[in-house]
Amino acid sequence: METPQPDKTGMHILLKLASLVVILAGIHAAADIIVQLLLALFFAIVLNPLVTWFIRRGVQRPVAITIVVVVMLIALTALVGVLAASFNEFISMLPKFNKELTRKLFKLQEMLPFLNLHMSPERMLQRMDSEKVVTFTTALMTGLSGAMASVLLLVMTVVFMLFEVRHVPYKMRFALNNPQIHIAGLHRALKGVSHYLALKTLLSLWTGVIVWLGLELMGVQFALMWAVLAFLLNYVPNIGAVISAVPPMIQVLLFNGVYECILVGALFLVVHMVIGNILEPRMMGHRLGMSTMVVFLSLLIWGWLLGPVGMLLSVPLTSVCKIWMETTKGGSKLAILLGPGRPKSRLPG
């Protein structure tokens, strides 16, 4: 009579969960260097189509990479210079923001008896401090500037990635046991992420330009800074467009008026409706194959792991993880849970 074997399913699940916790803790601890690598990979993916475009027109790869990287550096240097001046001026005006906010709160206090509210202006000021209102903006800028601090290291990493990208399929063909499956998965991941980042960058650029022109026409101060913020936060799914509208609306409410604040809010709403809800779904479709809930949860998880840069790149990072799961034996079922809608067929076994 054979002795029944104990069920070790629970133990296996606990081991996998423990391994996941260790991996996530390691990623969180090494966030500084991982953010640098992710930014380099982001630039490499976005710039590689330009390099390919030059190569198809007879330009040698080293020359093409040099041209693209130099143009990128010139554009980033000019943008950072303009933003630094605007941001320093904005920081210097924060005391004026507090003073104006205090005046508005004292004016609001006259209405409190009619609203049956009992709160002193000092207490409201503590809750609505303008410095706290722009905390997220400052944290985002600080996170990006900190990640971009080692510009030389970042540029060198991008250059090496652009040189090595053409050799990756050949290396994998010799290194993997089943290269056809893994190369197909890698190709699908790179194609999906490249398509997503290219279109998202283009749509974010349109968003930033339209916001900048609209705010300039309204005479809003720091229009370029708010436009760049809208450009960056457009990478953040679901909540990015809402967050980018809050600081300029508060600024306009304090220094211009309620009517102008409504106009600024309407500008952001129209831009988000047209670009985010009409153009983006039509241009992208469901190429990344993730549900809305998974997109939102990935925003929270990657934001906790890697900070603001993790929030900006949460969708492509989760997409790569999903495609990697689909090419592994034990991860295909979990990949189905990350997908949108109902699965069309059951997995064998």
Swiss-Prot record:
Gene Ontology cellular component terms for the protein in this record: plasma membrane
Gene Ontology biological process terms from the UniProt entry: transmembrane transport
Cellular compartments annotated: Cell inner membrane
Periplasmic topological intervals: 32, 84-142, 230-234, 279-292
TM annotation in the entry: 11-31, 33-53, 63-83, 143-163, 209-229, 235-255, 258-278, 293-313
Family: Belongs to the autoinducer-2 exporter (AI-2E) (TC 2.A.86) family.
Protein name: Putative transport protein YhhT
